[in-house]
Amino acid sequence: MSKLRCADFLRLGTNNRTFAALILVVLMSAASIVLARPAIASEIPAAERKSGYEFMSGETRAMQDDDAASPAMLWVLDGKALWNRKDGEANKSCADCHNEASSMKGATARYPAFDKSIGLPIDLEQRINLCRTEQQKATPLPFESRELLALAAFIGQQSRGMPISVRDDEKTRSFIEAGRTIFERRQGQLNLSCAQCHDDNWRGKLAGAPITQGHATGYPLYRLEWQAMGSLQRRLRNCLVGMRAEPYAFNAPEYVNLELFLMWRARGMPVETPAVRP
């Protein structure tokens, strides 16, 4: 199309000329975006960080603000029941080890966390399944299952309002940097990076919807688009598919490293779990 001459253009039929014109407009728009885009993503200053909550409509904010109106609370209620349910060969419940759920206050704010038994960081859902296999002698809950999301949401609710505070030390630093590399790396057929949207262009819109800063402050959360609760890994997979990139398998180290970086990137921001998003 870039070599289409005026004479060739005029010889096209009306419908074909219209199509060709649209393609030219798309190409020119794409070129202007590329030229306007900063070459290197810049980290958002702490004073300018904004939760996805601040980009939502008043109606959606009201849904998150009122537990009685939030559909996410259906999962939290299930999680409360699961917290007290005995399971596995050990016939133990979460409460048998941890007593009241309030003992989990601050846990979500600290995850993903380094697990010395495997020498890698793990996220909260993986920690729940480790407890099931090691303490309850039960089978792991399927990733993205209602039960696992419910437990993660119930545990996460105990940290609501607390500042995110993942560890940044000699054990986690290399994994945080690995997550940063994924965040800033161009991927997929669209040759986009996470940072281009969420660091450089968060004041803009995409298909009429606000581009947020991408802070992972409320997972697992209820997404109106999904009509269900979902994990941060599910959201990351959606983004990769949108970039026309190959998504990783659930629980892949790349996802956990990216989760860790995103929580480090949101350090100091309050936990919103279980959040609601459009």
Regions found by a protein language model. Give the residues of each.
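Short cysteine/histidine-rich metal-coordination sites, predominantly Zn2+-binding motifs
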Residues: 109-118, 210-219
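N-terminal, post-signal-peptide region of Sec/Tat-exported proteins
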Residues: 65-96
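Short Cys/His-rich "knuckle" micro-motifs
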Residues: 104-107, 204-207
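The canonical Cys-X-X-Cys-His
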Residues: 91-101, 151, 179, 191-201, ...
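N-terminal secretory signal peptides that target proteins for export/translocation
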Residues: 1-17
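Short coil/turn and helix-start
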Residues: 88-89, 188, 249
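Post-cleavage N-terminal segment of exported redox proteins
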Residues: 8, 18-75, 112-177, 203, ...
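Long compositionally biased, domain-poor regions of proteins
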Residues: 81, 193, 212, 241, ...
